[in-house]
Amino acid sequence: MKNVLLIEDDMLISNLVKFRLKKDGYEVTIVEDGQAGIEAIDTLSPDLIITDVMMPFRNGLEIINHAKMVNPKVPVIVLSSLGEEENTVLEAFTIGASDFIPKPFKPNELSFRVKKWLKYAS
């Protein structure tokens, strides 16, 4: 079973994502801030990471940098509000983000992209 690490401080979004991905057969670990995300990357070795950009303690760009240092091949999907600056999105791709999904998003779209990136990474 593939392990997905979700780093998101909005519990409503976290629960929605977890419900959908568990339905698809994935193991989902949720952490609520960037520092906990860094620690989870080190201890869990996730197959895929989904991260918000704006979070307490560490931001999504720091998450991407750390994830790519630990495992350059791990796919990282960035979830972010439509109001995020374009430069932040471009920087996320520059440092190694695999995909970007604007909030609000459709659970089916997220499910499709997770499946695609896990297949691509294997």
Question: Model-predicted segments: where are they?
Answer:
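Conserved acidic carboxylate
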Residues: 8
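Two-component/phosphorelay signaling modules centered on CheY-like receiver
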Residues: 11-29, 117
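Acidic catalytic/metal-coordinating carboxylates
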Residues: 33-36, 59-62
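Active-site residues of response regulator receiver
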Residues: 52
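Receiver (REC) domain active-site loop signature in two-component systems and cognate sites
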Residues: 55
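Alpha4 helix (beta4-alpha4-beta5 surface) of REC/receiver domains from two-component response regulators
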Residues: 62, 83-99
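Hydrophobic/aromatic residues positioned on beta-strands within the core alpha/beta folds
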Residues: 79-80
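C-terminal output helix
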Residues: 105-114
